[in-house]
């Protein structure tokens, strides 16, 4: 089956179809050759190429292909790589590489992104929070409220009781005497077991009420 031509409408259809991260990556990978040819033959398609490469970049992050994302930034046509959104992608990649959580949330939430990529920006923020939650749960025996909030992009200055409630609702324990949270370890479920994903989705629904 022939691949439909790359266009803004086709790109939107791929992004909004709600595929898994792997499906999204595979679908966008198939268009990289078309994008490369467009950049060489039709400079007027700059907006399309910017949207495509931004979406393709996020498909790498959503599948945790950080090294491959770095390689992608080196393949992007020079005239596109110089655009603001591509520079922002590079900033985000550097922050992810260096595990600078506060900077990651700031870039995702405060810097401008191409319109069609907004769903992927939000999707990656949720993915990064889920991933960070698992890492915290399995790396810390105890953690202070402010640190836990910062890792998940919550406002450490928010009402302490609200933050505590969000974590205890996820199975964490609160030691009021020592002012410490005790994370609940997350056991990685088998691929066909949706229990871990369901728990993470519940967690993200809880913390999303905190806002940015």
Swiss-Prot record:
One GO cellular component, as annotated: cytoplasm
Q: What does the UniProt keyword field contain?
A: Cytoplasm, Nucleus, Signalosome
List, alphabetically, the Pfam families matched.
Answer: CSN8_PSD8_EIF3K
**In this entry, which stretches build a coiled coil?**
none
Q: Which residues form the PCI domain?
A: 26-193
Q: What is its main location?
A: cytoplasm
Residues of the signal sequence?
A: none
The answer to whether UniProt assigns keyword ATP-binding to this entry is no
BP-aspect Gene Ontology terms? COP9 signalosome assembly; protein deneddylation
Any idea where this protein resides?
Cytoplasm; Nucleus
Disulphide bridges, residue numbers: none
Subunit arrangement? Component of the COP9 signalosome (CSN) complex.
Reported function: Component of the COP9 signalosome (CSN) complex that acts as an regulator of the ubiquitin (Ubl) conjugation pathway by mediating the deneddylation of the cullin subunit of SCF-type E3 ubiquitin-protein ligase complexes. The CSN complex seems to link protein degradation to sexual development.
**Family to which this protein belongs:** Belongs to the CSN8 family.
Name this polypeptide is given: COP9 signalosome complex subunit 8
Species per Swiss-Prot/TrEMBL record: Emericella nidulans (strain FGSC A4 / ATCC 38163 / CBS 112.46 / NRRL 194 / M139) (Aspergillus nidulans)
Q: Which gene encodes it?
A: csnH
């Amino acid at each position: 089956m022939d691949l439909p031509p790359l266009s803004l409408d086709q790109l939107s259809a791929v992004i909004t179809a709600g595929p898994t991260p792997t499906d999204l990556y595979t679908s966008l990978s198939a268009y990289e050759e078309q994008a490369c040819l467009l950049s060489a033959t039709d400079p007027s398609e700059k907006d399309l190429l910017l949207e495509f490469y931004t979406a393709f970049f996020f498909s790498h992050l959503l599948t945790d292909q950080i090294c491959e994302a770095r390689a992608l930034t080196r393949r992007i046509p020079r005239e596109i790589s110089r655009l603001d959104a591509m520079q922002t992608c590079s900033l985000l990649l550097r922050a992810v590489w260096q595990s600078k959580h506060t900077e990651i949330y700031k870039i995702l939430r405060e810097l401008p992104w191409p319109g069609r990529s907004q769903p992927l920006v939000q999707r990656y923020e949720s993915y990064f929070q889920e991933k960070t939650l698992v890492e915290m749960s399995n790396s810390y025996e105890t953690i202070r409220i402010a640190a836990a909030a910062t890792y998940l992009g919550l406002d450490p200055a928010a009402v302490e009781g609200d933050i505590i409630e969000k974590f205890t609702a996820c199975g964490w324990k609160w030691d009021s005497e020592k002012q410490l949270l005790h994370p609940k370890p997350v056991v990685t479920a088998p691929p066909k077991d949706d229990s871990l994903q369901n728990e993470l989705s519940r967690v993200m629904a809880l913390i999303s009420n905190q806002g940015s």
